[in-house]
Amino acid sequence: MSRRNRAPRRDVPPDPKYGSRLVTMLIHKLMMRGKASLAARILYDALEIVRERTGQDPLPVLENAVRNATPLVEVKARRVGGATYQVPVEVRAERGTSLALRWLVTFSRTRPGRTMSAKLANEIIDAANETGNAIRRREEVHRMAEANKAFAHYRY
């Protein structure tokens, strides 16, 4: 690890189509091997599918999905005197959003279906409706934190 100062957090520019920073972050999470335009096309197609299926503007649906999938607490391993404890810690807003987007993309990739756009659209709709794998993962993380509440005094 570098001993220099921490790198400053870069500002995420809003995407050109929706003017949303969240959409740009999701494009970056989707991107593989630097193919940003392909990732953008997949996401825009997915958002169009969301518009068709829900009959609503896709941006609020996406924001709702990310809000629902964002964890409030998580566990971090902390070593104390030879034993490793899973210590529950609160999740900062940026990390929570990042985790939610990561889970949406990861579970979209593992879904059965033909195109990535359709799979991502389904995961976004499910997350907006409080169902789906991303929501299940958030619940799992919350359960782990709840189960290890006794070690909260080892907080970082």
Swiss-Prot record:
Residues in coiled coil: none
GO annotations of cellular component type: small ribosomal subunit
Record keywords: Ribonucleoprotein, Ribosomal protein, RNA-binding, rRNA-binding, tRNA-binding
GO MF terms held by the record: rRNA binding; structural constituent of ribosome; tRNA binding
GO terms classed as biological process: translation
Family matches, as Pfam families: Ribosomal_S7
Family affiliation: Belongs to the universal ribosomal protein uS7 family.
Job description of the protein: One of the primary rRNA binding proteins, it binds directly to 16S rRNA where it nucleates assembly of the head domain of the 30S subunit. Is located at the subunit interface close to the decoding center, probably blocks exit of the E-site tRNA.
Quaternary data: Part of the 30S ribosomal subunit. Contacts proteins S9 and S11.
Protein's recorded name: Small ribosomal subunit protein uS7
Origin organism lineage: Bacteria, Bacillati, Cyanobacteriota, Cyanophyceae, Synechococcales
